[in-house]
Amino acid sequence: CNPSHAWVAPAGGNRPLLGTNPLAFGWPRPNGQPPFIFDFATSAIARGDIELHHRENKPIPEGWGIDRLGQHSQNPADVLDGALLTFGGHKGSALSIMIELIAGPLIGDLTSAESLAYDDGAGASPYHGELILAMDPERFLGSTLEDYMARAEDLFSSIIAQGARLPSQRRYTARQRTQKEGISIPESLYQELSRLARL
């Protein structure tokens, strides 16, 4: 997990103070299966998605952000000038604050607000720390490792049996499709990339 620039208002707040503060988790799977992985922002949506809506002149759904006056807005330009909101209200806000603390002050680095102040309008990438925890299941489980890994697979199978999908399943499917068919991008992005290539 890591902070970013301060682009997100805390639950009940009206101006940016927190970062999008992504959180990721990975779990190995046997027999050559891709790992169980999720990686998501603690904001209602990633800032990049707001930027894509802005580029395509598309409104954003209610609940993604507020304008600089703290009013809910569906205008991506207003939200980019205001603040994103956390996902899940106070729960998402609490997770975001936790990430600020453990990947900022706890490791001797900046918070998202401090990163944005340090940037001083330069528009550079966030200046932040990262906290990565890696655990070796064999150290916890020893000779029972395979039994417990099988229990994890049972959990995954039970989720899929209900018609739900695992986080990252869609990503793996999209990756396979892209490897076969290439990528598709909006015409507006193609035009922008073409323009940049001519510079």
Model regions: which residues?
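Phosphate/diphosphate-binding glycine-rich loops and adjacent basic-rich segments that engage nucleotide
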Residues: 7-76
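Glycine-rich beta-alpha junction loops
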Residues: 42-45, 91, 137-139
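Structural motif
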Residues: 15, 22-24, 34-37, 62-65, ...
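Catalytic-core signal marking the mid-to-C-terminal active-site face
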Residues: 106, 111-199
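Short, acidic/small-residue loops that bind anionic groups at enzyme active sites
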Residues: 1-5
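Short, contiguous, pocket-lining structural segments
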Residues: 13, 17, 30, 79, ...
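Small-residue-enriched flexible segments
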Residues: 46-108, 125
